[in-house]
Amino acid sequence: MKALKFFILVSIGLVLSSCSMEDEINVQEITSKNVIAEIKATGAKGIPFPEGSKATTLGSKDFVKITLPEDVYYVVKDEEGNVSRVSTLGIRCKCLKGAGCSPGTYDGRYFCTAELGACSLCEVHAGLIESLSAKGEQKEVQIVGVMDEREDKFGAYAKRGGFGQIEREKESTIQYGITEDFFKCKEVHEALMELYSAVYRTHYDEEIPDFIKSNSDTIPSDHVYIRASLFGNTVFLPTPKELAIEAGLEMVDDISKIHCTCSQGTGCTKDRVYVVVFCNAGNCSDCTMSK
């Protein structure tokens, strides 16, 4: 079996000509059993490419633009630690050894693979469309999660305010994985604070409790954790027990009962930000949360 090697670099360049012509391309699904086996063995994460995403050329065979469906965003972090969300990324597949590196999708992710030709090392460059450079000047950025606002989940629920509005447990639509930096995204942080404010100010006429502000590893005895979706990512939220009962939500009373499991790659450790318990994906490409 010919080994497939992945090397993924997510980067930001400087300038891409605004006059480039764009033609939609059909990115083929990866079907080779050898390639799929190597993806699973290496834990390669690829680039999120959920259903409804589009790939278009950027005036050069070396560059492809991925456009996510409406209301879906990449959350990225640059070298300076700045976190933001974008709906498009520029992608370039490049063969470093040999020839024949080609793009393909598998399990909702975009890869550059050595499935064809004699390429033994494929490299994926991904960056902000507005700043890709035809000269190759680049600045690295990391994908720290995906935001999905298409359904009535955490973000929409927080804006309306009230646990009675949240639907019973729903599976996340995108399981790419998130890290602690995901919570530094302005839109994620604001939604989380709006949620907590709605719960405590609306129902109890109180400010957000100190145990949340201090990111305590324990919750008060009158609170529980409920499973919810944070922009399409599975998390457990601290919630007053009486509200969870009123809404008919499944409850977990102890963080030790929440588990994170990695089946491909490494990482997927239990973590928390503002007492939101989540699985920190790290380099795991298949990170799942359970109780």
Regions found by a protein language model. Give the residues of each.
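Bacterial Sec-dependent N-terminal signal peptides
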Residues: M1-T31
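Surface-exposed charge patches in extracellular/virion surface proteins
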Residues: A3, R160, R201, Q264, ...
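Aromatic-enriched hydrophobic runs in primary sequence
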Residues: K5, V83-R85, V275
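N-terminal propeptides/leader regions of secreted preproproteins
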Residues: C19-K94, G127-K257
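Secreted, short cysteine-rich peptides and small extracellular cysteine-rich domains stabilized by multiple disulfide
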Residues: G90-L128, I255-K291
